[in-house]
Amino acid sequence: MLTNTRLVHGQHDHSRCVDAALSRAEDLCQKKNAKLTPTRATVLSILWQSHRPLGAYQVQDRLSKITGKAIAPPTVYRAIEFLLRLGLIHRLPSLNAYIGCPFPNSEHSNLFMICIECGCVAEIADASLNTRLQTACDKTNFKLHSQNI
């Protein structure tokens, strides 16, 4: 885990991240004939508003504040499941939380650096790591299901 927030994520405009994520989501949904509902889009926006993972109940709280209505947990979980299925977000099991995926259209290892001071998360796609992991699996007759480094 990294402890230097500048290494994890430099200064930038988070609204650009949100806009780019929504644009990628719209494109992907169109290609897969899936519907990006307003609730799903808002949940995705919430997860991209910072580079910190959020739990489902944190997402629920923010969604309720944005809409001005009480949002039931199943509504949030359905949106999260949809976004996970399309690869638009990741679940971080070690934190029981979710974060936006900057590489939804590509096969990649889910390698995350997590700052222990501020909670910032950076995802890294490393093709050589994928290759090494697959080679190790092939040699040992394992099928890669998930990893935690």
Residue locations for each model-derived region?
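Pre-recognition alpha-helix immediately N-terminal to the DNA-recognition helix
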Residues: 41-46
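Short, Lys/Arg-enriched N-terminal segment that forms or immediately precedes the first helix
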Residues: 19-33
